[in-house]
């Protein structure tokens, strides 16, 4: 089952990367040479950002199989409450002097 989950996770990552690539088509259209050059420059800049983002998506590790909540619950179950000592029957000397 983990192989299937790994494969589904990889397919999901690849679909996301493909979607990112499809959202940035190569610039087409009329205009002066400087307008076309600027459109291509902006496109290359977006393309580099998409490649960096795709690399981060692809290399980002999957969450651990053991959810942190389960580990936290196990840790909490191991905790015990210690018996507290009985409170003193007489107030300390400093409090008695302050009251007088």
Swiss-Prot record:
Instruction: Give the GO molecular function terms.
Output: DNA-binding transcription factor activity; RNA binding
A GO term from the CC aspect: host cell cytoplasm
Q: Where mainly found?
A: host cell
Region of interest: Disordered: 22-41, 81-100
Keyword Ion transport: yes or no?
Answer: no
**Where is it located?**
Host nucleus, Host nucleolus; Host cytoplasm
The yes or no answer to whether the keyword Iron is present is no
Q: Where is this motif: Nuclear export signal and binding to XPO1?
A: 71-82
Q: Where does motif Nuclear localization signal and RNA-binding (RRE) map? A: 35-49
GO:BP terms for this protein?
Answer: mRNA transport
Which pairs are disulfide-linked? none
Superkingdom of source: Viruses
| Cross-referenced Pfam families | REV (PF00424)
* Keywords, alphabetical: AIDS, Host cytoplasm, Host nucleus, mRNA transport, RNA-binding, Transport
The Polar residues compositionally biased stretches are 22-34
User: Could you tell me which residues belong to the region Homomultimerization?
Assistant: 16-24
Question: Its function?
Answer: Escorts unspliced or incompletely spliced viral pre-mRNAs (late transcripts) out of the nucleus of infected cells. These pre-mRNAs carry a recognition sequence called Rev responsive element (RRE) located in the env gene, that is not present in fully spliced viral mRNAs (early transcripts). This function is essential since most viral proteins are translated from unspliced or partially spliced pre-mRNAs which cannot exit the nucleus by the pathway used by fully processed cellular mRNAs.
Oligomer status and interactors = Homomultimer; when bound to the RRE. Multimeric assembly is essential for activity.
Q: What is known of its domains?
A: The RNA-binding motif binds to the RRE, a stem-and-loop structure present in incompletely spliced viral pre-mRNAs. This region also contains the NLS which mediates nuclear localization. These overlapping functions prevent Rev bound to RRE from undesirable return to the nucleus. When Rev binds the RRE, the NLS becomes masked while the NES remains accessible.
Q: Return the protein name.
A: Protein Rev
Q: Which organism is it from?
A: Human immunodeficiency virus type 2 subtype A (isolate CAM2)
Per the UniProt record, the lineage of the source organism begins with: Viruses, Riboviria, Pararnavirae, Artverviricota, Revtraviricetes
């Amino acid at each position: 089952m983990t192989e299937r989950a790994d494969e589904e996770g990889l397919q999901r990552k690849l679909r996301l990367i493909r979607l990112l690539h499809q959202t940035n088509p190569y610039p087409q259209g009329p205009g002066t040479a400087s307008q076309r050059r600027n459109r291509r420059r902006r496109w290359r800049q977006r393309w580099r950002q998409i490649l960096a983002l795709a690399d981060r998506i692809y290399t980002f590790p999957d969450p651990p199989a053991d959810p942190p909540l389960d580990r936290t619950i196990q840790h909490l179950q191991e905790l015990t409450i210690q018996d507290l000592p009985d409170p003193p029957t007489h107030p300390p000397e400093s409090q008695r002097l302050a009251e007088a």
